[in-house]
Every structure is written in structure tokens, then in C-alpha cells.
Amino acid sequence: MLILTRKLGESIVIGDQIQITLLDIKGKHVRIGVNAPKGIAVHRGEVYEMIQDENKKAFESDVKNSEMLSALWAQVKIL
């Protein structure tokens, strides 16, 4: 992990397209601004983890449904 020190108004640039700027510091809270192309998703860590969990659940559900449909189709073919 790269650790950088920044002052208010200073930025960090990631690649050619992402810029992160330190906007405000109040006590333990830090406000940052993220400037990135619309095609790049930007989420808080906890939101990203929730999205990943939901995607995993949806995938597992799709696999289970696919297996059930395959079993039903096999039974229909036998009849």
C-alpha cells in the first residue's frame, strides 16, 4: 500500500484519468473529491463490499436455478 501525505487542496493522480483531491478535514473526518471518467465506478469501501456480496448471491442463485431447470428439462425429455 502506498501511503501519501497531502495538504488541503492537494491531489493524488492515479493513471491518466483519476484525480483525488483533499477537500476538507474536520476532526476525524476527511472529505475527498474523486474526479474520474463516467465509465469508472467509484464507491466507498463498504458500499463496494455490499455490491460484491449481492453479486455473489445473485450468481449463486442463478447457478441453483439453472441446475433446477436442467433437472426439470431432463425429466420432461424422459416423458
From Swiss-Prot:
Chain coiled-coil ranges: none
Alphabetically ordered keywords of this record: Bacterial flagellum biogenesis, Cytoplasm, Repressor, RNA-binding, Translation regulation
Gene3D superfamilies: Translational regulator CsrA
Main location: cytoplasm
Disulfide bond residue pairs: none
PANTHER family to which the protein is assigned, alphabetical: CARBON STORAGE REGULATOR
Family listed: Belongs to the CsrA/RsmA family.
Name of the protein this chain belongs to: Translational regulator CsrA
The species this protein was found in: Syntrophus aciditrophicus (strain SB)
UniProt gene name: csrA
